[in-house]
């Protein structure tokens, strides 16, 4: 692990700074400045993120506490609203369920008199009906108020569920003096309202729907319903039993109405006292609160025993008309002594009412306190959980910080090593750069030589291409010459053919002349035939249809031409002459056909050679001039082609000479370049040798200067010693 804050280890620079070293140091300083700026930016961003996280955590905690406090306030408002509704509904039910003063006075008078059984039974029936009506009205009002309470407290079921199932142990809160059940009816009547009330409260606690403002309506309803059930279960009872039951019901109604009227005042006083003392539980130390489960069991047991043990206890009190059996201590303030109901019934009812009020207030305060305590414990548990999570996250962040510090230190060591490597790389780079400069110089020289060689090769290629073009031109000219020679040969052949044709036509002309001569001879013979008795038909007679008078003797009628032909046929009979003429005619037709075939052959030959054939009539007239002109044209073209051929041959020879000359120049340039390279190498070697000699000469000069200075100092010292010796002498 590297030490933090060790900084960069710079190597000592022995030599002077060069421009490259200064540039590299400037780049390194800029990189360090950028790295420091990045580190500062990262630190600032990290601080901003931490502050943002803290702010978000604070917002979450404030939001959570505000939500809890809002829920508590809403629950308190709903409880106050439900209490107000319950109070108004119970006031209405109590106002409707009150009996007239005449009934009260009659019940009191009956308690001290000994009237007959008929009046007692009638009053008992009236009390039973009144209790039945009041219980019905009370049950209706309770059901309405209970529906209102359910609608107002339905949103808080989850919040108020399990209110009295906290960590506090309620098993320690017991009755100091439990209620004892006696054999008299009055004890059961006075103990039933409390039992039913507590049973209802226990059931509400178990259901999680406890509300301080609605805890008295079920007790009232239980009181009236228990009394009605007891009245129904005992149809035959004494007058004092009926008076006691009626007076107890009336006192309970008065206590209930007074409870609803004085509830707000007593609760306010109690909260003020508890606030002054600083604790809520300290005010209920002297009051015992029963365990809910045990109280529920006791109440059920007591209710069952009272319901099923009344017939046995009915006979025990039938003979005592004007006295009450003393109540067992339902409160710590009444004690355990026996007292008469006729002496102080209102005091016992007021004490019982105070006890109920106090217990209801205690239960209300206890419920609120336990609810607040439960919420505080939940919030405390959540805060502790958040604190643990924060501690864990802080530990993780601390570990991450230590790891990052370790990584930073290792990275600093790596950076130092990299800087050392960078310095080494810079030195190697300088050496390589110098070597690169030398290689670049050599490369530039070689590039110059290469350019020269490329230029020579380019010129050679140009000459070769030009030679190829000239060779192509020569080949084309040779082909043209060959073509001209072929055309000349073709023309010569054509001229020979025309000459032969001319000879053939000359023969035909001779034959024509001969035929003309023969025709004249035949005409003469015809004339001679007329002389021998042959009739010559004149030329104007058509088909010899002239009517001639028959002449004496057998004379054949022929035309003049036929007569000439017959004369030209020779002498002899007419048949022989005609046969001779027919043979001559066939020979002439065969000759004509032969001439036509020759003429067609000549025309086809002339069409193949792209030349026009002359008309036989034209050939007869001007064939010599055409042949002469064609010969002149052919001779002129031949001479022209010969001139071109000679000229192209001269060009070829000149180009070949140029190629040879250029090749010689390329060879000379190559040899000159090689010689120049050799000279350059020699000059470089000479330069290096001279530089070495210069360095050695400079070194020698420095040594000589040093020796000279040393000698001068010795000379001065010797002079000083000499002057000192002379001065001493």
Curated annotation (Swiss-Prot):
* Keywords of this entry: Coiled coil, Developmental protein, Wnt signaling pathway
Give the Gene Ontology MF terms in alphabetical order: LRR domain binding
- Which segments show compositional bias classed as Basic and acidic residues? 115-126
Keyword Coiled coil in annotation: yes
Q: Basic residues bias: where?
A: 84-93
List compositional bias (Low complexity) regions by residue number: 137-147, 257-268
Mark out the compositionally biased spans (Polar residues): 99-110, 304-320, 607-616
Show the coiled coil region(s): 27-69, 357-531, 574-722
Location of region: Disordered: 80-156, 230-268, 289-344, 600-621
Q: Which GO terms describe its biological process?
A: dorsal/ventral axis specification; regulation of DNA-templated transcription; Wnt signaling pathway
Q: Record's family?
A: Belongs to the LRRFIP family.
Q: Main role?
A: May function as activator of the canonical Wnt signaling pathway upstream of ctnnb1/beta-catenin. Might be required for dorsal axis formation.
Q: Under what name is this protein listed?
A: Leucine-rich repeat flightless-interacting protein 2
The source organism is Xenopus laevis
């Amino acid at each position: 692990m590297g030490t933090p804050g060790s900084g960069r280890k710079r190597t000592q620079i022995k030599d002077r700074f060069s421009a490259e070293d200064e540039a590299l140091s400037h780049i390194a300083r800029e990189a360090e400045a950028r790295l420091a700026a990045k580190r500062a930016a990262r630190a600032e961003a990290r601080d901003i993120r931490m502050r943002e996280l803290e702010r978000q955590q604070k917002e979450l905690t404030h939001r959570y506490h505000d939500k809890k406090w809002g829920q508590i306030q809403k629950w308190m408002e709903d409880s106050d609203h439900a209490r107000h509704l319950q109070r108004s509904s119970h006031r209405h039910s109590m106002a409707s369920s009150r009996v007239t003063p005449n009934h009260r006075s009659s019940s009191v008078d009956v308690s001290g008199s000994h009237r007959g059984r008929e009046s007692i039974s009638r009053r008992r029936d009236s009390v039973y009906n009144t209790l039945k009506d009041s219980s019905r009205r009370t049950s209706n009002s309770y059901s309405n108020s209970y529906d209102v309470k359910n609608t107002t407290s339905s949103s808080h079921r989850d919040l108020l569920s399990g209110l009295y199932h906290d960590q506090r142990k309620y098993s320690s809160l017991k009755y100091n003096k439990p209620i004892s059940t006696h054999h008299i009816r009055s004890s059961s009547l006075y103990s039933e309202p409390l039992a039913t009330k507590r049973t209802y409260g226990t059931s509400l606690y178990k259901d999680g729907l406890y509300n301080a403002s609605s805890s008295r309506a079920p007790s009232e309803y239980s009181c009236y319903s228990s009394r009605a059930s007891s009245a129904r279960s005992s149809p035959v009872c004494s007058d004092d039993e009926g008076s006691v039951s009626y007076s107890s019901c009336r006192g309970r109604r008065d206590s209930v109405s007074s409870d609803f009227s004085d509830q707000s005042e007593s609760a306010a006083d109690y909260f003020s006292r508890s606030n002054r003392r600083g604790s809520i539980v300290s005010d209920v130390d002297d009051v015992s609160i029963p365990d809910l489960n045990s109280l529920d069991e006791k109440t059920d047991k007591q209710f069952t025993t009272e319901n099923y043990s009344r017939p046995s206890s009915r006979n025990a009190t039938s003979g005592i008309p004007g006295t009450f059996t003393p109540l067992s201590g339902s409160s710590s303030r009444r004690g355990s002594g026996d007292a008469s109901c006729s002496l102080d019934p209102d005091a016992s009812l007021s004490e019982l009412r105070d006890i109920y009020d106090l217990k209801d207030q205690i239960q209300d305060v206890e419920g609120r306190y336990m609810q607040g305590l439960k919420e505080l414990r939940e919030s405390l548990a959540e805060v502790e959980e958040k604190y643990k999570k924060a501690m864990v996250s802080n530990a993780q962040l601390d570990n991450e910080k230590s790891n990052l510090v370790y990584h930073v230190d290792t990275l600093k060591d790596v950076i130092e090593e990299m800087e050392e490597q960078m310095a080494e790389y810079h030195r190697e780079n300088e050496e390589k750069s110098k070597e690169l400069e030398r290689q670049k110089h050599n490369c530039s020289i070689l590039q110059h030589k290469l350019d020269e060689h490329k230029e020579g090769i380019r010129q050679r290629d140009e000459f070769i291409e030009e030679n190829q073009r000239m060779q192509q031109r020569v080949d084309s000219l040779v082909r043209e010459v060959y073509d001209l020679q072929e055309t000349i040969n073709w023309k010569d052949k054509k001229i020979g053919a025309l000459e032969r044709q001319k000879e053939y036509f000359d023969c035909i002309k001779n034959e024509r002349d001969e035929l003309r001569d023969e025709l004249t001879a035949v005409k003469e013979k015809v004339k001679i035939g007329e002389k021998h008795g042959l009739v010559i038909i004149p030329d104007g007679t058509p088909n010899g249809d002239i009517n001639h008078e028959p002449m004496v003797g057998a004379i054949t009628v022929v035309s003049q031409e036929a007569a000439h032909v017959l004369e030209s046929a020779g002498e002899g009979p007419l048949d022989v002459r005609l046969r001779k003429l027919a043979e001559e005619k066939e020979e002439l037709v065969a000759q004509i056909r032969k001439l036509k075939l020759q003429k067609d052959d000549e025309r086809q030959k002339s069409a193949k050679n792209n030349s026009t054939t002359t008309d036989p009539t034209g050939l007869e007239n001007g064939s010599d001039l055409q042949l002469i002109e064609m010969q002149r044209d052919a001779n002129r073209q031949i001479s022209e082609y010969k001139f071109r051929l000679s000229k192209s041959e001269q060009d070829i020879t000149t180009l070949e000479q140029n190629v040879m000359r250029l090749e010689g120049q390329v060879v000379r340039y190559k040899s000159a370049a090689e010689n120049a390279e050799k000279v350059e190498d020699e000059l470089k070697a000479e330069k290096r040798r001279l530089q070495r000699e210069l360095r050695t000469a400079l070194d020698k000069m420095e040594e000589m200067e040093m020796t000279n200075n040393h000698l001068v100092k010795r000379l001065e010292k010797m002079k000083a010693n000499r002057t000192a010796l002379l001065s001493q002498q």
